[in-house]
């Protein structure tokens, strides 16, 4: 954003992840880590959490409409607002299979508003995938897949289409 011949950092309001998955304590941390990796200073200046919380009005956003994101942007002073929910992140064994197999079901919603470019994007996401169980022994497969989903949607925020 130009101001007196200088480019200023875009002010970024990150709405806390609305995590509706019981017994999942890592999703919010993954969400914030991916945001911190994607939106770095000096290009982006993250607005303080207490300011965003006050603008959102509650910890779990349920309204991803353009009007609501515009309100959050106005009340927080943000140029860009990012919001996401995780409604389902569940894996289960599939039987009978030749090799033990797991199926992952993941769903939620992602939205952003960029006042600089005028872009608004909202998408309900739903994904299911299968993997041989042996490949998940030394990893947190569910968390890794959620992180990939977060990264793919955060890329949309920085695109200018």
Each PLM stretch: what is its role?
Residues 1-13, 29, 72-75, 91, ...:
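C-terminal/domain-edge helix-coil "capping" segments
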Residues 8-14, 20-83, 117-119, 153-156:
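N-terminal segment of the mature soluble domain
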Residues 19-21, 53-54, 89-91, 132-134:
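A short, flexible beta-alpha/helix-coil linker loop
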Residues 23-24, 91-97:
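Extracytoplasmic/secreted cell-surface and envelope-processing proteins
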């Amino acid at each position: 954003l130009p101001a007196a011949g200088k480019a200023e950092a875009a002010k970024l309001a990150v709405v806390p992840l609305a995590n509706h998955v019981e017994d999942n304590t890592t999703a919010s941390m993954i969400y914030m880590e991916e945001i911190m990796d994607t939106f770095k200073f000096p290009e982006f200046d993250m607005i303080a959490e207490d300011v965003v919380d006050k603008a959102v009005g509650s910890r779990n956003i349920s309204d991803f409409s353009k009007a609501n994101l515009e309100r959050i942007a106005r009340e927080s002073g943000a140029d860009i607002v990012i919001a996401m929910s995780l409604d389902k992140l569940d894996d289960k064994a599939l039987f009978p299979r030749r090799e033990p197999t797991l199926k992952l079901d993941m769903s939620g919603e992602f939205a952003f508003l960029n006042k600089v470019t005028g872009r608004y994007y909202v998408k309900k996401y739903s994904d299911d995938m299968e993997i041989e169980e042996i490949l998940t022994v030394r990893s947190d497969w569910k968390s890794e897949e959620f992180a990939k989903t977060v990264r793919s949607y955060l890329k949309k925020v920085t695109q200018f289409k």
